[in-house]
């Protein structure tokens, strides 16, 4: 081996870069082409943006098989008379029963 110039960065050393360019092929030879190819093709690791997968739309027939749930009625819960009448009851009780 020839001595390497210490002023060069490690990624610029002779022989550190492959002689051929990287390709989109996923064969065994191309997967082991260089470290970058091995990581992306061989191991399947990519740090770029993930592409959105389009969801498969279900066939139109499958929607008819789903059971439709009845919607709950919009009745107020709690006291059916409402808060206004309750206030009136409290006022009447205080008028009829003077404690002080």
Swiss-Prot record:
Q: Name one GO molecular function term.
A: RNA-binding transcription regulator activity
Q: What is this protein called?
A: Protein Tat
Top-level taxon of origin: Viruses
- Cite the record's Basic and acidic residues compositional bias ranges: 82-100
Residues where N6-acetyllysine occurs? 28, 50-51
Can you tell me which residues bind Zn(2+) 2? 25, 27, 30
Q: Which residues cross the membrane?
A: none
- Organism of derivation: Human immunodeficiency virus type 1 group M subtype B (strain 89.6)
> Region Cysteine-rich: which residues?
22-37
């Amino acid at each position: 081996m020839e001595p390497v110039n210490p002023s060069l960065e490690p990624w610029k050393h002779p022989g550190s870069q492959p002689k051929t360019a990287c390709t989109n092929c996923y064969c065994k030879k191309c997967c082991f082409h260089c470290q970058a190819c091995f990581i992306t093709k061989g191991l399947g690791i990519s740090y770029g943006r993930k592409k959105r997968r389009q969801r498969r739309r279900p066939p139109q027939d499958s929607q008819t098989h789903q059971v439709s749930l009845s919607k709950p009625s919009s009745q107020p819960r709690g006291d059916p008379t409402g808060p206004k009448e309750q206030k009136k009851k409290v006022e009447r009780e205080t008028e009829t029963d003077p404690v002080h």
